[in-house]
Amino acid sequence: MTIVDAKFLQSAQSVNDSPAPNVAEVAFLGRSNVGKSSILNSLTSRNGLAKSSSTPGKTQLINYFEIKFKTKNEETPYLFARFVDLPGFGYAKVAKSLKAEWNKNLTGYLQLRPNLQIFVHLIDSRHPELEIDKNVDEFLKEIKRGDQIIVNAFTKIDKLNSSELSKLKRDYPDGIFLSNLKKRGIIDLQDKITGYLFGN
């Protein structure tokens, strides 16, 4: 199964002004500068689809993208889902500050969106043990429903040497390992998403 089309749908400030929850959604979240926009663009083969903005306020919006998948089934040749680009979170060091870092609306989206199926937590492979990422992982595990999964995807692996990458893979055997620069792991992430959403 491959992505054949991707387009920006809308931005929203909260779950209340989000699109109708009638299509499965995949949420991408991670620290600021983790490479989230680049990964989204590589996944969809659409340069500039997701844009990292330096404009204050822009980064606080939830951005929705409609994704069209081509199947191998003649009866159902296309399937649809949404990728959701969430605001990057900052560098808070205390667990209690997590919900303050993310505004109330973002937390509401993560907890209340009924069609949200996959959390893709993007983590900088050079700093896999940061407290903020551990806090996010714990938070997601707390709110995760039985029909949802968390995917830990490690970005910028081209910055690691071979022994560092081997250790990372040992430490996180279920992780996805990505290099946007060298386009490594992109298909692995796509397969993980489509396998869970559509069973293939």
Swiss-Prot record:
| Signal peptide residue numbers | none
Which molecular-function annotation in GO is an example for this chain?
GTP binding
Its domain of life reads Bacteria
EngB-type G domain residues are 22-199
Q: Which GO terms describe its cellular component?
A: cytosol
Q: Which cofactor does it need?
A: Mg(2+)
Which positions does UniProt annotate for Mg(2+) binding? Answer: S37, T59
User: Which of UniProt's keywords are assigned here?
Assistant: Cell cycle, Cell division, GTP-binding, Magnesium, Metal-binding, Nucleotide-binding, Septation
Return the HAMAP family for the record: GTPase_EngB
Q: Where does GTP bind?
A: 30-37, 57-61, 85-88, 155-158, 177-180
Q: Which InterPro entries match?
A: G_ENGB_dom, GTP-bd, GTP-bd_ribosome_bio_YsxC, P-loop_NTPase
Name by which UniProt lists this protein? Probable GTP-binding protein EngB
- SUPFAM superfamilies, alphabetically? P-loop containing nucleoside triphosphate hydrolases (SSF52540)
Which protein family is it in? Belongs to the TRAFAC class TrmE-Era-EngA-EngB-Septin-like GTPase superfamily. EngB GTPase family.
Query: Biological process (GO) annotations?
Result: division septum assembly
Which cysteines pair up through disulfides? They are: none
Q: What does this protein do?
A: Necessary for normal cell division and for the maintenance of normal septation.
